Amino acid sequence: MEFTLTEERNPLTSDIDTLPTRDMLTLINAEDQKVALAVRGELPNIAVAVDAITDRMQRGGRLVYIGAGTSGRLGMLDASECPPTFGTPPGLVVGLIAGGSAALTEAVEGAEDDWQSGRRQIAELDVNENDSVIGIAASGRTPYAIGGLEEAKKRGALTISIACNRPSSLEGRAEIGIAPVVGPEVVSGSTRLKAGTAQKMVLNMISTAVMIRLGKTYSNLMVDVQPTNIKLRHRARRIVAEATGLDLQRATGILAACNGEVKTAIVAILAGVSPEIARIRLLETGGYVRKAIG
């Protein structure tokens, strides 16, 4: 079995069970501070991944996450946040987890060791050369994620790995490897800690940067937000007001006239056109608000 730093004992926390609570938390916090630095070291690789994913998604491709345990749950979480945040259609960003939906809330014994299951799920998605598949595994050796990347590569998809060990078997199957090496965990082998935090940070970066590149924001405003609840409806009104400089009452009225479409309202206001013309401009510019304003 290959060496994995994430499974090693952390010499700095060997006495953690003897510490007062405040000292214990201080030690955990000190270890957590290493995570952002490890992620920063991988920014060049993350940037390459973002640009490559964006290129494929502009050709109609999907973004697929595949992983087991904590890694799989993090992928599922990131995928599930894209529709309400960026207005992506269901199926554009997909999360696959070993053991299926049951594994979101409880351990499914042996699921992560099922190499064939990873391959099968990628095949069932009919992954193709326009898609991007990210295998996530703290150890970098999870058979389920490795099988998924192997099948994706066979089908011509872009393959990316996120692991917290280097080198790793997972990275060996990927075109682009991202490996924030965070070192041994506070509790040996508990990769839901630093490794999980690092993976979440990388996934946040990838999905956010890709969506910005796809025109899902205007400035730093989430203009493709889907106002599906009271909080998001209030947010949509504030976004229109902040983007255009109008007071909240006027912005709310124009947003209503645009059927709640934030992008349409912003373009209509800033370009001085009707909602119908604003929609046409957005269609012609691929949904990029700045281009539609002209």
Where are these regions (language model features)?
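Cofactor-/ligand-binding subdomain signature composed of acidic, glycine-rich
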Residues: 1-38, 42
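Gly-rich Lys/Arg/Thr-decorated short loops/hinges at beta-loop-alpha junctions or inter-strand turns
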Residues: 27-35, 95-106, 218, 259
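A short, well-structured juxtamembrane/interface segment
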Residues: 41-56
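Residues at the C-terminal ends
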Residues: 58-59, 154
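Glycine-rich phosphate-binding loops that contact phosphosugars or nucleotide phosphates
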Residues: 64-201, 208-214
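EF-Ts-like protein-protein interaction surfaces
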Residues: 187-203, 226-239
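Short, amphipathic alpha-helical interaction segments embedded in low-complexity terminal/linker regions
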Residues: 210-294
